[in-house]
Amino acid sequence: METSAPRAGSQVVATTARHSAAYRADPLRVSSRDKLTEMAASSQGNFEGNFESLDLAEFAKKQPWWRKLFGQESGPSAEKYSVATQLFIGGVTGWCTGFIFQKVGKLAATAVGGGFFLLQLANHTGYIKVDWQRVEKDMKKAKEQLKIRKSNQIPTEVRSKAEEVVSFVKKNVLVTGGFFGGFLLGMAS
């Protein structure tokens, strides 16, 4: 069944052809418009081979963690703010992190210290008997395993993450400095 309405692509080609006829005085414009007209006409329904595929999962795996968090280029995006703004952003985030770290640290220290206190109390009253010879034997075994595993070579995963962190710190010195200053203030408050 044929309809009398023309296809949308043919309307674009006809409109482009009319506009290119109006600009016959400028040969550069005519040639570029003609090329666009030809490209539009030739690509109607033919999209094979014209596109390049990009595997986003592989692309995301290759990106450093701060680019995933802050965007493609964290350096220039941070540099677009003034020095005071960068220091303020770093200081506020550092203070919040330090404050939370302090509160969680106090809670963890209280739990560990309280648990140690209760264990000592239970040991002193006789509820728990510690086999100190076995503890000493296990400690020696653990020391030997650490000596065996100890090497001067850092694993590549750790080295690559450390290089990423150093690169981020170098690109964002003001934000990083503000963060550490704010972190220390947050720990103190």
From Swiss-Prot:
GO cellular component: mitochondrial outer membrane; mitochondrion; nucleus
Topological domains annotated Mitochondrial intermembrane: 102-107, 186-189
Positions of transmembrane segments: 81-101, 108-128, 165-185
Modified residues (Phosphoserine): S10, S53, S151
InterPro entries tied to this protein: FUN14
Main location: mitochondrion
Annotated GO MF terms: phosphatidylinositol-3,4,5-trisphosphate binding
Keyword field: Membrane, Mitochondrion, Mitochondrion outer membrane, Nucleus, Phosphoprotein, Transcription, Transcription regulation, Transmembrane, Transmembrane helix
Tissue specificity comment: Highly expressed in platelets (at protein level).
Swiss-Prot/TrEMBL GO biological process terms: autophagy of mitochondrion; intracellular triglyceride homeostasis; regulation of platelet activation
Membrane topology: Multi-pass membrane protein
Regions of this protein lying in the Cytoplasmic compartment: 1-80, 129-164
Function: Binds directly and specifically 1,2-Diacyl-sn-glycero-3-phospho-(1'-myo-inositol-3',4',5'-bisphosphate) (PIP3) leading to the recruitment of PIP3 to mitochondria and may play a role in the regulation of the platelet activation via AKT/GSK3B/cGMP signaling pathways. May act as transcription factor that regulates SREBP1 (isoform SREBP-1C) expression in order to modulate triglyceride (TG) homeostasis in hepatocytes.
Similarity section: Belongs to the FUN14 family.
Protein name as catalogued: FUN14 domain-containing protein 2
Organism field: Homo sapiens (Human)
Phylogenetic lineage: Eukaryota, Metazoa, Chordata, Craniata, Vertebrata
